[in-house]
Structures are given as C-alpha cells and as structure tokens.
Amino acid sequence: MTKAGKRSIGNKPDAVIHSPEEKKPDGRLLRTERSRQLIIDALCDLVQEGVLVPTAQTVAERAGVGIRTVFRHFADMEALFATIDIQLRESYEGLYLGGDRDGSLEERIRHAIERRAAAYEKLSSLMLSTRALMWRSPVLQKNYARNQRGLRKDLADWLPEIAALPAVRKEAVDAAASFETWDRLRSQQGLSTRASMEVVHEMLRLAFGIG
C-alpha cells in the first residue's frame, strides 16, 4: 500500500482523503450557532439597557426569532442563564483582578475600593438583574454564591490583615466592600462615584481601627 501523497506504481495518484477539518462547514450548523448567539446577545443587551427581568418573549423579539426557536436552543431560561454565565464569567471576573496590591494598609484599602468601584459600575445592570431573578433560579443562586465567595477571597488577598480581625469586623469589612452597599450609596442615597468611594473608604478604615 502506498503512502498518501505519493504516486502508486501505475503513476496514478492516490485518492486524497480530506480530514473533517478540511470539509466545508455545515450550513445548518452555522445557522444554528448564529441563532443561538443572537439569543444570548439579546438577553445581555436587554439587561444592559435596564430590563432586569427579561422574559423569553422579550428575548425572542430582540433576537428576531420566534419563541419556539429560543426553547429549541435552550430547554428553559435556566439553561440560557447558565450558558451566559459560561460566556461572561472570564470577562467579569477579570474586572476584579490585578491592581496595585502593594503599599500600606490604607493605600491598599483605597486601591481595592477603586478596583471594585470600576467593576461595580460596569456590572451594575447584570448584578441587579441577577438579584432580581435569583429567588426563582437555582442556577443564578449558585453562581451568585460562587461569585460572593470569590470576591471575599479576593478582598482577603488585597487586605490580608482581615485574618486578624474579630469575626464581627470581618463581616463588617465584607459588607462595606459589597455591591449591595455600593448600590445603596449610588442608587438610594444618590451619591456620586467619588463620594461613594469615600464613604466605603471611611467604613473600612473604621473596621480596621485606622485613626
């Protein structure tokens, strides 16, 4: 038997065997993936625009597909939420990473607040939507709890001095740095981003006993 790519004894070229990767993409598969992504993008856009409790019907209308198409791609809204989290998780978690984590405790407190403030401002609609929907969504409850654990761990990385605090102050630090506190300052108390940062900074200074 001759090797692929070489001529046989009769000088007839061997048949070329195409690998699956060389085959043309299946048109139906491409349309399916396109429709699926349109649905995902539609939900993300609606939430970003302030529609915090989007329905399958509003998602279908925004995506330009029938509601049956939505449920052909996703068994239910839970499946859609889970898929979106997979797509967005790396990008939203990345907003909290990095930053200047050196310096004195007070300097690191300020840097941590700046990092969180930027993330909270960018993710506000997504987080508010999650809060509004998660009472009936096990997927969102699970994801929210996971994210809260991650944020708590990240804050301890910024401020390892947390470990030496009494239990009640540890909880005070976590509460002061939370999105819920941030949203209250911004939405309910009407403070600017800068003023909200100063309030959180003062709360953390008090929790750490910085005079």
Residue ranges, per PLM feature:
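Short hydrophobic/aromatic patch on the recognition helix
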Residues: G64-F74
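Residues in the recognition helix of alpha-helical DNA-binding motifs
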Residues: H73-F74, T83, V199
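Basic, helix-initiating cap at the start of DNA-binding domains
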Residues: T2-V53, Q57-R62, E78-A79
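Amphipathic alpha-helical packing segments from all-alpha helical-bundle domains
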Residues: A118-S125, P138-E171, E198-G209
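Amphipathic alpha-helical segments used for helix-helix packing
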Residues: D85, Y96-L97, A117-K142, D183-R184
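Amphipathic alpha-helical linker/stalk segments
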Residues: K23-K24, D45-P54, E61, A82-A112
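Amphipathic C-terminal alpha-helical segment
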Residues: K170-T193, L206-G211
